[in-house]
Curated annotation (Swiss-Prot):
GO terms for cellular component: small ribosomal subunit. One of its GO terms (molecular function) is tRNA binding. With S4 and S5 plays an important role in translational accuracy. Keywords: Methylation, Ribonucleoprotein, Ribosomal protein, RNA-binding, rRNA-binding, tRNA-binding. It comes from Campylobacter lari (strain RM2100 / D67 / ATCC BAA-1060). This is Small ribosomal subunit protein uS12. The keyword Repressor does not apply. The modification 3-methylthioaspartic acid is found at residue 89. Pfam families: Ribosom_S12_S23.
Amino acid sequence: MPTINQLVRKERKKVLEKSKSPALKNCPQRRGVCTRVYTTTPKKPNSALRKVAKVRLTSGFEVISYIGGEGHNLQEHSIVLVRGGRVKDLPGVKYHIVRGALDTAGVAKRTVSRSKYGAKRPKAAAK
């Protein structure tokens, strides 16, 4: 515990909060260009082929982003919108690609949680 004199000489340091998505530079989303689209395997207890893309952002960073949903139309040079949000079982993947924005198509035949996957509302079934 510092004395009053010590506090007068040197004030307390503020605890700085570290950003979880530094490549976005305090923006909600960033535009980028896919440099590589590939699949990778998750950490130990899980098993799958997760779809990811390496994206060069307008902020100058090159990040690995997760492509959510079933199926996608992304390839090299696709323009994508990237948001924050990590994937727990993929080390180094701290960003998500926004479905239904720019070159990324929404998920086809999606009826639940459509807004998260860029899917339009289906037409009412004919009676």
